[in-house]
Amino acid sequence: MSADESAPEGRRRLRELLEGVDNVIGDAAAVVDGLAPLVGLGGAEVGAQESFWAVRTFLAALAEKRPLIVWFDDVHWAEPTLLDLIEHVADWSREAPILLLCLSRPELLEERRSWGGGKLNATSMLLQPLSEERCQRLIRTLMGSNDLDPALVSRITESAAGNPLFVEQTLAALVDDGLLRREGDRWIATGNLGSVQVPPTISALLAARLDRLNMHERRVLERAAVVGQRFYLDAVVELSAPADRAGVAAHCQALVRKELVHADRSDLPGVEAFRFLHVLLRDCAYQATSKRQRAELHQGFAAWLQARMMGRPGEHDELVGYHLEQAYRYRVELGLRDTETAELGHRAAACLIEAADRVRQGDETGAAGLLKRAITLLPVTDPLRIRAEIDLGWALHSFGRFSDAERMLRQATDRAARIGDTGLRAHARLAHLRLMFATSPEGLVAETLGEATRALPIFIQNGDEVGAALACRSQAAAHMAAGRYALAERAMQAAVRHAEESGVLRDAQTMRRDLVHLLSLAPRPVGESVDRATRALAGVGDDRGLRRSLLAQLAVLFTMAGDLDAAMDHLARAEEIVWDVRSPRGDPLYGGFVVARIALLTDDLDTAEHELRRSCRRLARMGERAHLATRAAALADVLVKLERLDEAATYVSRSRDA
């Protein structure tokens, strides 16, 4: 796929690859919709599990035509979400002939211990250093000759210590020095190689190669190193002094001939790209520049990239934010704590927060990392920092890290109050109360209802539809906790309206799913709820999570209506989606409880006990108490019916304590 390719053309090519394998993929359009945002073709944001499903299904479809090898290079640099994706494909594609080949440094196994052994269908192979004989064979192969000075071959072999990069770069250094000349397919010595000094380490060797460059080539390489392992010709031109710009392209070609860089596919339309031959070369060139130069060049590249991206907002927020962040940190290290430095930090944080907003739907872990970096760039009373702390609190909550989330949200609430920002304080306080509902629910119904009711007009007056949706959702949570399901449903309907008005897709999706969970609880005839859910299911579109929730609720409703065949059919369809995206039976708050409710309604006490025990264990591990109280009470009721009164008493106590 090319950076110059249009989104419709890219989607068409993806669909072509999926032709003829309908038995594997089912819904090709859904697969393309899931892949498109991942490969830069735009489209609606999807969650991580939906993205994983799309990638896995796509690879399985390709493997249906012929065995498939997927190669991941330098996996030790991968973000956790990419590692999760690789693991997902390995775990859930066992019927497809797919080989996932991951090249990595050994330290990856410190993060993913099972990848080194013990994981099904996984094995590891440690590449040993080249033996002396193989090292010498590599030298002869690269030179195209056996007629080499034995002493030189021996010195290179000894210094390389089995590292093929060292061998390659040593021979390249001899070419740089004019001691080797190419004739046809062979390299010929131009003088006595017996006295050549071989640097003792790869770092010294690479530094020596860079020292041999002329001044202009060196400057080009140093500016390229600030851009990154892959760099853009136009960016290096922009970062160069006006008098040097005309020669940058020629110097890049000279660096290609010297095998320090090579042409690379660009991810920016209409821009020529190159890549350093090895990351160590890039690091060596980068370290040769001063901190002041790095700060200026990082800032300059961020400005160039933003100018290139005009009209395509948001696509490179993370990269722009990274370079502004580096410029800020180098200025701080130099003691330049002035207005310009503070402004750099603010701009960097804004970009990182925007990037977090973009990736949160599909990569909550990555979004949290971006927010943490943004927070460190801002003063403690900066509203932008407080907003980032609130978002990070929500992320920590979703990870089940309740104590960290509680501390972050309490801190954000206090800081927002200190600067007198009522809207920001309301956001922080409602988020804090939402968390406390899970961990310390005593006496929070009235307080949450009061806070939400006071906050709603503030949000509406400020035009803050996201805040208004949060306030209505908080009202619904309070009403649900009090058993007032009709009022809860009314509040959630308002939350959905505000979320849709906000234009924030993920918020609207979350609110719709929360509203669906009330279908089997609201006080109305079952048939009416079935009709509502059926109509909603017909118009659900490509939101697989919402489809799953609706199918699960229809399973409960049909069970209430006594139509067990329809109930089991809808439950099976819901679970097919759940397992398909590898979200373990939904989430611990709702997923398992759907099966338990159906089991309770049909007097299947063994299944009800199994599901409720599992749900209680999960909630207890998370430190969640509000739902645990309900599940423990339901389990106690099941145990009474099974005449296991001592165990029932234990769960009555757990429910009361929660």
Describe each model-derived feature in a short phrase.
Residues 71, 99-104:
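Structural recognition of the conserved hydrophobic beta-strand(s) that form the central parallel beta-sheet
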Residues 303-307, 356, 373-376, 410-421, ...:
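Amphipathic alpha-helical segments of tetratricopeptide repeats
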Residues 262-263, 284-461, 466, 477-490, ...:
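Inter-helical turn/loop elements of alpha-helical hairpins
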Residues 10, 81-85, 104, 108:
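Helical "lid/switch" subdomain of P-loop NTPase nucleotide-binding domains
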Residues 322, 350, 387, 425-429, ...:
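Residue register of alpha-helical TPR repeats
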Residues 1, 100, 122-129, 133-369, ...:
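Short secondary-structure boundary elements
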Residues 1-69, 97, 113-125, 130-146, ...:
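Conserved Walker-type P-loop NTP-binding/catalytic site
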Residues 62-82:
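Conserved P-loop NTPase "ATPase switch" module shared by AAA+ and STAND
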